[in-house]
């Protein structure tokens, strides 16, 4: 019952309050900077010193999030040295739920926590997972809702293209 109530509340918050912010985060818009609690201190979005930040909003009850984490691990490993930083923002109300998820689906990238959901509202998140690719200045390069392995090639291509553009004179 508690879980169903939490899901219903999150749905209302995500759809009701997030809609206006979604319009502000179209491609080319500057995303609001975030400073969130992480396991080893504060986590900044966009990530400090990163050429690109992949921001992923997730929750422990999100089925597609379980599929996206291994892919994000791959992207961090493959492109981290080139300047990509993956930041996954957990929106669970209970920290223990996120901890259980992370025991089952490990993350080799930064995890930030926002039980209030304020960051999701500011980024116009309407469902999970929702991912946003930001350049070093916080400009939105890509916004993607959901995750399926079939999405992976196009998402990776967007990361490659953005990194190549950053390197070009």
Regions found by a protein language model. Give the residues of each.
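Structural microenvironment flanking redox-active thiols in thiol-disulfide oxidoreductases
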Residues: 66-105, 115-121, 157
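Bacterial N-terminal signal peptides
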Residues: 8-18
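Positively charged n-region of N-terminal signal peptides that target proteins for export
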Residues: 1-4
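Boundary at the C-terminal end of the N-terminal hydrophobic targeting segment
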Residues: 18-24
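Short pre-active-site segment immediately N-terminal to redox-active cysteine/selenocysteine motifs
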Residues: 51-53, 57-61, 127
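A short beta-strand-turn-helix
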Residues: 33-53
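Thiol/disulfide oxidoreductase modules built on the thioredoxin-like
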Residues: 49, 100-108, 115-160
């Amino acid at each position: 019952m508690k879980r169903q109530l939490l899901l219903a509340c999150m749905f209302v918050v995500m759809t009701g309050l997030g809609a206006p912010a979604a319009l502000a985060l179209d491609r080319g818009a500057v995303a609001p900077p975030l400073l969130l609690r992480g396991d080893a201190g504060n986590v900044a979005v966009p990530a400090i010193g990163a050429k690109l930040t992949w921001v992923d909003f997730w929750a422990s009850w999100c089925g597609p999030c379980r599929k996206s984490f291994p892919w994000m691990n791959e992207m961090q490993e493959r492109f981290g040295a080139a300047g990509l930083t993956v930041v996954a923002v957990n929106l669970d109300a209970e920290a223990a739920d996120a901890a259980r998820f992370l025991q089952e689906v490990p993350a080799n990238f930064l995890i930030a926590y926002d039980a209030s959901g304020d960051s999701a509202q500011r980024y116009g998140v309407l469902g999970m997972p929702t991912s946003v690719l930001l350049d070093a200045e916080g400009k939105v390069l890509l916004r993607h809702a959901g995750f399926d392995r079939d999405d992976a090639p196009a998402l990776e291509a967007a990361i490659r293209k953005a990194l190549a553009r950053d390197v070009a004179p």
